Design a protein with these regions (language model features):
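A structural signal for short, well-ordered beta-strand segments and their strand-loop junctions
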Residues: 2-5
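Flexible, low-complexity linker and terminal segments
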Residues: 7-221
């Protein structure tokens, strides 16, 4: 049997001494280091031997958490985990709420970009759907009872894409179909075919994914 575990090095990571358990849970929930158990006694295929059920929302890219202040739901990505560790401070900038209007929500950005866009460096091409502006993407984060806004470096957005890809690979080995991945591929195919404009993709990326997921669920009923 193989078990994967994660723990912080508190001084190096910029984490309080009593937060090791919390950080391990956060990095798991953010898909930074997903939890899995590999037990070959269960069968002769990966689908039988690999267990990822310790992770939240196992058929989606990210899981949703509720803001204790506003009651609103948001997705917990690896960028949100990075906010909790001081070692990533150079990749995060605090924003005033009004300044976020000029930036791209991370949820929308992640629909626009794939791992192949990273490999072929399309994320550096202005005008391409996958272009990532440095500190031009933002997230909201609940801290000390209020909602904070953080701009992300280009490298941190790329980190989100890479961790999402790794999670999708792990899901597939465990025999889990990622519904968001299917929706994203369909949306980008429509963009490439001219059925969906770049303007709508940029403005409604995450909303389009949500609509596709709802439509797929309704079709099953």
């Amino acid at each position: 049997m193989f078990l994967q575990a994660f723990t912080t090095c508190q001084p190096e990571h910029g984490v309080a001494d009593d937060m090791a358990l919390h950080q391990a849970q956060r990095v798991r929930d953010s898909r930074g280091v997903p939890e899995f158990v590999f037990n070959p006694r269960l069968g002769e295929t990966y689908q039988e031997a690999l267990d990822v059920k310790g992770n939240p929302s196992i058929d989606l890219d990210w899981y949703e958490t509720k803001n204790k202040v506003t009651g609103e739901t948001s997705r917990y990505t690896v960028a949100h985990w990075c906010v909790t560790e001081a070692r990533f401070r150079n990749h995060l900038k605090k924003l005033k709420p009004e300044a976020s209007a000029k930036l791209i929500p991370l949820d929308n950005m992640l629909v626009r970009i794939t791992q192949q866009d990273i490999v072929y460096r399309r994320y550096l091409t202005p005008g391409h759907r996958a272009f990532i502006p440095d500190f031009g993407v933002y997230i909201t984060y609940e801290e000390n009872g209020k909602t904070d806004y953080r701009a992300l470096s280009r490298q941190l957005v790329m980190f989100c894409v890479e961790r999402r890809k790794a999670w999708r690979m792990l899901q597939s080995k465990a025999g889990i179909v990622n519904r968001e991945y299917i929706a994203q591929k369909a949306i980008l195919a429509d963009v490439d075919a001219g059925k969906l404009s770049l303007e709508e993709l940029f403005a409604r990326g995450h909303e389009l994914v949500t609509e596709r997921l709802a439509g797929a669920m309704a079709a099953k009923v």
